[in-house]
Amino acid sequence: MKCCKVLKKRYVYRKIRNTFRCLLGNLNDKFVKIDFEKINIKELPELEQYMLHKIFNLNTLFKKYFNDYNFHTLYKELLHFCTLDLSAFYFDIRKDTLYCDKLESKKRVLTIKFLNIVLEILLKWFAPVLSFTTEEIYSLLKIKEKGSIHLEKFPNIPSNWNNQDLSNKWAELIKIRDKCNSSIELKRASKEIGSSLEANLKILLNEKLITLSKGTDFSELCITSGAKIDKINDKNSEEIIIETSKAEGQKCPVCWKINTKPCERHLS
């Protein structure tokens, strides 16, 4: 039993450490301290705005649990954010932007900006429970003003990061994404496709969800080669129907997306 507990703790710690590794690796020693009050929320893509809303809510919980000395629940909330909200969701979606977009592309620049924000906040959140790890990472960032993560103040998150309407919208988009992922997994299980990038999606939605999804790229959210949205048959009582097919064409050697035409992102 003791051995199992030790292995479980190691597994949990590795998850958190891997989150920091991902942040540091993508920032590539170019950490920039950002004034949260001066961030223009509207210039960020919706995905980043949604993640800032989640950070705002988690910071509220962080203060409550910290003041109540409820470190166990605090640790669980932070772990949930690292493993589900960041690793399994945000990083998964944005890895295409980070690895395949040009360094100077606006979306990539704003993604890097968000990673800077997340790294700074995570270090301050985890400092009370992972003191040595956060100090080690902080020393790599070469921030001279304070000299130690434990001399930093807890993050003060601006109120304009809180956007419940956007959160409600993304709750619906994530439901659609989950349905898409389930459909993709069925095709993978039947060996019709390998990775999700071998899939094309046809997403049938009711009128309300079509309006809600306007401007959303589900091929990006679901990591597929293509995604098309269409109106669901009025006689059908379901809100969401997903049809997944094998993508046809040539694989782009950079982003690995499959298309019958040359990849417009990487023509040069």
Indicate where each model-derived feature is located.
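Structured ligand/cofactor/substrate-binding pocket environments in proteins
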Residues: 1-24, 76-79, 110-135
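Conserved phosphate-binding loops in nucleotide/dinucleotide-binding enzymes
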Residues: 1-11, 68, 72-73, 163-171
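Acidic, turn-prone loop/beta-hairpin segments
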Residues: 29-60, 91-183, 190-205, 230, ...
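Hydrophobic residues within the alpha-helices of tandem HEAT/HEAT-like
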Residues: 82-83
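A glycine-rich helix N-cap at a beta->alpha junction
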Residues: 215-230
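Short, flexible, mixed-charge glycine/proline-rich loop motifs
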Residues: 241-249, 256-257
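Short cysteine-rich clusters marking metal-coordination/redox-active sites
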Residues: 252-255, 263-266
